[in-house]
Design a protein with these regions (language model features):
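Positively charged n-region of N-terminal signal peptides that target proteins for export
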Residues: 1-4
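N-terminal secretory-pathway/extracellular module detecting exported/lumenal segments
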Residues: 23-87, 91-192
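Intrinsically disordered, low-complexity regions enriched in Ser/Pro/Gly/Gln/His and often acidic
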Residues: 7-8, 114
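Bacterial N-terminal signal peptides
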Residues: 8-15
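N-terminal prepro-regions of secreted/extracellular proteins
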Residues: 10, 20-25
């Protein structure tokens, strides 16, 4: 029994050494062959920003009406000496893309005679069509050293810089940019 426990402990140590966390520094994020800076309205110009790790972008779609993407996105917060890595999964309901809703205006007007184009904004505010789920997160210092990842506050575990993806908010623009990197077109330009 002791040999078995010793072997299991040795196996765990061996696995951990091969699966160690790969830290990312702020300097590495500037490598445009590996990362793309997402220029967004939330950037203050003080060195903060969001970066997509290009090699992690994956189309994981399983349905025709919903496109799904997984990626690693890094959020840099210099004032907190923090680079936060998010592994995120986005689901995009193509029936709620802006272009698709505009194409349906004649149908909406038939059902609701007072319907006008501005109502699409209200539809998008009620349901953006994008759902983002954080699958994992890891914190690093700006120099790339691992840092303990703090859990979210109770009730806010899923509120991040990237989720929820409410229409016309920062997180929505980031998700739209991720969609374009994978499919070559912005989510809101897709017409079914």
């Amino acid at each position: 029994m002791k040999r078995f426990l010793f072997f299991m402990a040795l196996l765990c140590i061996w696995c951990i050494s091969f699966n160690s966390v790969k830290a990312v520094s702020n300097a590495e994020l500037q490598d445009t062959s590996r990362f793309e800076h997402i220029v967004s309205k939330g950037d203050t110009g003080g060195g903060d920003g969001k970066y997509i790790e290009l090699s992690t972008l994956k189309d994981v779609s399983t349905s025709g009406s919903t496109k799904s993407v997984e990626a690693k996105i890094y959020v840099v917060l210099p004032s907190s000496d923090l680079v936060r890595e998010y592994t995120i999964h986005y689901d995009y309901n193509l029936n709620y893309s802006f272009a698709h809703l505009v194409a349906k205006v004649p149908e909406f007007k038939q059902q609701f005679p007072d319907f006008y184009l501005g109502e699409i904004w209200n539809i998008k505010m009620d349901n953006s069509g994008i759902v983002g789920t954080v699958k994992a997160q890891q914190d690093y210092t700006l120099n790339g050293e691992s840092k303990p990842t703090k859990p979210g506050y109770k009730g806010y575990e899923y509120v991040t810089f990237l989720t929820p993806t409410d229409f016309d908010f920062e997180s929505y623009h980031v998700a739209n940019r991720v969609f374009k990197k994978v499919f070559g077109i912005f989510y809101d330009d897709v017409s079914r």
